[in-house]
């Protein structure tokens, strides 16, 4: 599994973000789209891991604003690379069950 299993709109969104910020290290699809339990109400959960990030909250706000250009079902989650590990409960779940896109 990988990029080919990711909704096209999510790929376009990630490509757009990568052009704006080349400091993206990795991206993951997680949640219902990753585990195959998609419903009509499912959002598209994306973990976006940055090499360095001064403020995850500010980046989270920016990512949420930028998603409006694509689809409000996209649910981006910003992480610093240094925080994206098994000691972070959400990151741990993503590492175990998510699909690495880039």
Predicted regions and their residues:
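Short hydrophobic/aromatic beta-strand micro-patches
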Residues: 47-49
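Catalytic core of pol beta-like nucleotidyltransferases
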Residues: 1-26, 35-40, 51-102
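Conserved H-loop
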Residues: 32
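Short, conserved active-site loops that position catalytic residues or coordinate cofactors/metal ions
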Residues: 42-44
């Amino acid at each position: 599994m990988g990029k080919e299993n990711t909704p096209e709109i999510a790929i376009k969104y990630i490509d757009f973000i990568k052009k704006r910020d080349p400091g993206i290290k990795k991206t993951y699809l997680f949640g219902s789209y990753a585990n195959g339990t998609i419903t009509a109400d499912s959002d598209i959960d994306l973990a976006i891991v940055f090499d360095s990030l001064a403020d995850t909250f500010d980046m989270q706000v920016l990512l949420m604003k930028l998603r409006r250009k694509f689809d409000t079902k996209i649910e981006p989650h910003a992480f610093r690379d240094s925080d994206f590990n098994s000691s972070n409960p959400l990151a741990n779940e993503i590492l175990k069950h998510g699909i690495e896109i880039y």
